Amino acid sequence: PHTPTSCIVGSSDVYKRQLHDFGTRSTNEIEKDLLKFSKERKMELILPCLYSELEGSALPNIVEEISKTKYLDHIIVGLDRANEAQAKKAWKFFKKLKSPFSILWNDGPALKKLDKELKKKDLAPNELGKGRNVWYCLGMSIARDTARSVALHDCDIKTYDRRMLAKLFYPVVNPLFNFEFCKGYYPRVANNKMNGRVARLLVFPLLTALEKTIGRSDYIAVSYTHLTLPTKQDV
């Protein structure tokens, strides 16, 4: 599959369900709804990335796909591991986006100063990485105080298309739904094994259910070997 197969949504009572993509609605139809919803429910996208990803094969396509959307109010790019010259190049790179955007330069003097002040109050993240990047991006989103819904996703998804973004927003933006969060998932294959949420939340439970229903079989046993099995905490 080239797009997320499903998403998990939840509401305030911690009830969760999986919404599978059966392809019954086109991307254009979903985006048409989102554009209508955006008039009263502004949407903001967070893109945490490394500068090196600008030179990879995934992010240029992601930017191109996002540039085709019309429902986003604002985009926050969290830029990590970039010097001043690279930050300027990043600004030119993300100008391809059609929506208004801001770049949070995490290695810049302003962010370093803020990080230092927050550390004195024991409020800053202790470890460098994507978590810290997202933490500051969310802080910027809260400070802007314009978005009704915020989505974020990685910048290394090689099979990305704009349907993924539309499906992330749709369950939480649609006023007829009561969902407060949504997680998309899609196959991640490495070392001849399927990884990620699609293995943990879809394939593994499916194989377990089949095993309980029809009993042990060589086919199911072999299928397990092609998964990165979840830990007890994941299950």
Each predicted region: which residue ranges?
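A conserved acidic beta->alpha catalytic loop
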Residues: 79-90, 99, 108-110
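Active-site-proximal specificity loops/subdomain of glycosyltransferases
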Residues: 95-144
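Conserved donor-nucleotide/metal-binding helix-loop-beta segment in metal-dependent transferases, i.e.
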Residues: 162-181
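N-proximal low-complexity "stem/linker" segments adjacent to membrane-targeting elements
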Residues: 12, 16-64
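Short loop->beta transition adjacent to catalytic acidic/histidine clusters or analogous donor-positioning motifs
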Residues: 42-43, 67-77, 100-101
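Short beta-strand-to-loop element that shapes/binds the nucleotide-sugar donor at the catalytic cleft/hinge
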Residues: 180-196
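Short, small-residue-biased leader/transition segments that mark boundaries at the very start
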Residues: 1-15, 228-231
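Short beta-strand-to-loop acidic/aromatic patch adjacent to the donor-nucleotide binding site
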Residues: 147-156
